[in-house]
């Protein structure tokens, strides 16, 4: 009797849980709600990637000093015989400071390894994303980042830390590119797309700026492995949430997917090249200042450890303000995205030039805040422009174009940790900042080249020029039919029939 009641109760609970799961699944698969959840997943992935990138800033220098700057040497101690001769000798091992361990070079290479591998991987990951979609690469990226973070937590040698850092670069090439491309794909209306990309940029900024104090506090009070385990746990949860929303390895119902434009064609597009150059240029000051500003603060203003630790934290708020202002302006005046980017470059240039003039911590906060405000203007204005350019000039598949954007960022962050210290040593901190500021100001007029982009419409003549090969898929076949239709004097009905015939043929072929 009791067993039967227990079974009945378990059956009711199981059916209730199943019904609840169906409701949750149905609610999550509602199109507008689903894209919001996907935006949250992408933002968490961006947050994790940038936190992992910056969390090692207060941890690695101190940790490397303990594991790399000492070497094991053996000292031979002679023992005298009774007649004064050396009969025996004993050896003992001691730790001696290693004069050949160049910590600055080691740290610079470790920091740059992530961006270098990301830079090398992006051409391939962009093409892969164009072929398979956005969800599988995002899941691959989160998986690689999870294992990279775990390796960081328990790695105890420079070689293992270097491998973990490089592995993170590969994960970022998948996760960052597919995440941004997914946002561009889900949010097709320009104002919504700009807003969604702005939210993602806010999470990127928050991750970069909050990670150093987060890592420093946990490292000091809980040990090296704790901050990395926290990040790996969040990464695991983000991957599980992604699997709940999408089914990346389920059988694909869409047989005829659009074929993305090869990345080499996008790279030689003059408009995309101008945008990519602006993204690299605006991030150079940040990438070159991060490894050099702490030493300069210590020498110039005798800054304390906590001041050097929170140098970039106040800049988070003007960065968010810059994102918000650009989103609002883009919604009201969408034709001036190029102008917002140009203003941002000028602000970055002026801020970079004024940093060496600061003589105390309070003064330094002002140009750093202005610098991040300008970066927010450039990024928020130009990232949606890349998707718009692909929409009007190519096929609306965004993996390769955002791989180019990721390459632009990676160039700056690959060169910064390696070159910045040497430039400061050879030329000086003042000359470094003046050079970076001048480059940004001189690049700003180049964005005038983009002033007519928003008036562009997809045109058959432009497609004729850009599409050099014959039709390879449904989209290009229809485009070819439309071209023929445009050439015929009374081709409206026949053109429509031809397109329908193409659709019928494609459907019959897929069956």
Curated annotation (Swiss-Prot):
Belongs to the major facilitator superfamily. Vesicular transporter family. It is found in: Membrane. One of its GO terms (cellular component) is AP-2 adaptor complex. GO terms for molecular function: acetylcholine transmembrane transporter activity. Residues 485-511 are annotated as: Disordered. Residues 58-108, 157-165, 219-225, 289-306, 359-363, 422-428 are lumenal, vesicle. Residues 1-36, 130-135, 187-197, 247-267, 328-337, 385-400, 450-511 are cytoplasmic. SUPFAM superfamilies: MFS general substrate transporter. It comes from the Eukaryota. The chain crosses the membrane at residues 37-57, 109-129, 136-156, 166-186, 198-218, 226-246, 268-288, 307-327, 338-358, 364-384, 401-421, 429-449. Its main location: membrane. GO terms for biological process: chemical synaptic transmission. Involved in acetylcholine transport into synaptic vesicles. The keyword Transport applies. It comes from Torpedo marmorata. The keyword Acyltransferase does not apply. This is Vesicular acetylcholine transporter. PROSITE patterns: MFS (PS50850). It is a multi-pass membrane protein. Gene3D superfamilies: MFS general substrate transporter like domains (1.20.1250.20). High expression in the electric lobe of the brain. Keywords: Glycoprotein, Membrane, Neurotransmitter transport, Transmembrane, Transmembrane helix, Transport. Pfam families: MFS_1. Glycans are attached at residues 80, 83, 88, 302.
């Amino acid at each position: 009797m009791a067993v039967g009641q227990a079974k009945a109760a378990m059956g009711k609970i199981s059916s209730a849980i199943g019904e609840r799961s169906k409701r949750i699944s149905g609610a999550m698969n509602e199109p507008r709600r689903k894209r919001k959840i996907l935006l949250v997943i992408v933002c968490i992935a961006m947050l994790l990637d940038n936190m992992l990138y910056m969390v090692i800033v207060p941890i690695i220098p101190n940790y490397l000093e303990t594991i790399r700057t000492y070497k094991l040497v053996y000292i031979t101690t002679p023992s005298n015989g009774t007649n004064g001769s050396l009969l025996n000798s004993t050896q003992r091992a001691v730790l001696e400071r290693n004069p050949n361990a160049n910590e600055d070079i080691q740290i610079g290479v470790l920091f740059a390894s992530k961006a270098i591998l990301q830079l090398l991987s992006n051409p391939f990951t962009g093409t892969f994303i164009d072929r398979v979609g956005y969800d599988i690469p995002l899941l691959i990226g989160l998986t690689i980042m999870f294992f990279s973070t775990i390796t960081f937590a328990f790695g105890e040698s420079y070689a293992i830390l270097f491998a973990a850092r490089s592995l993170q670069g590969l994960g970022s090439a998948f996760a960052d590119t597919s995440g941004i491309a997914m946002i561009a794909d889900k949010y097709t209306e320009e104002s919504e797309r700009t807003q969604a990309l702005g939210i993602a940029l806010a999470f990127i900024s928050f991750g970069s700026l909050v990670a150093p104090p987060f890592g420093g506090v946990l490292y000091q009070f809980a040990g090296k492995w704790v901050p990395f385990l926290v990040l790996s746990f969040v990464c695991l949860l983000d991957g599980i949430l992604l699997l709940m929303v999408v089914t990346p390895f389920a059988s694909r119902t869409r047989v005829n997917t659009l074929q993305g434009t090869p990345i080499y064609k996008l790279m030689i597009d003059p408009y995309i090249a101008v945008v990519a150059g602006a993204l690299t240029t605006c991030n150079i000051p940040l990438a070159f200042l991060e490894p050099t500003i702490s030493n300069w603060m210590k020498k110039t203003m005798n800054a304390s450890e906590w001041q050097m630790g929170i140098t970039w934290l106040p800049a988070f708020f003007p960065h968010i303000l810059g994102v918000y202002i650009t989103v609002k302006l883009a919604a009201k005046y969408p034709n001036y995205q190029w102008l917002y980017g140009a203003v941002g470059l000028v602000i970055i240039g002026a801020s970079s030039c004024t940093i060496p003039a600061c003589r105390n911590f309070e003064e330094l906060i002002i140009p750093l805040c202005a610098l991040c405000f300008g970066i927010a203007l450039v990024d928020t204005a130009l990232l949606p422009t890349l998707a718009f350019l692909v929409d009007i000039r190519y096929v609306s598949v965004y993996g390769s174009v955002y791989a180019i954007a990721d390459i632009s960022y990676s160039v700056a962050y690959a060169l910064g940790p390696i070159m910045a210290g040497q430039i400061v040593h050879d030329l000086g901190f003042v000359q470094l900042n003046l050079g970076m500021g001048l480059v940004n100001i001189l690049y700003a007029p180049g964005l005038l080249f983009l002033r007519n982009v928003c008036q562009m419409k997809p045109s058959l003549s432009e497609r004729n020029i850009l599409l050099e090969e014959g039709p390879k898929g449904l989209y290009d076949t229809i485009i070819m039919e439309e071209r023929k239709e445009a050439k015929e004097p009374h081709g409206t009905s026949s053109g429509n029939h031809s397109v329908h015939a193409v659709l019928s043929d494609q459907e019959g072929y897929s069956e």
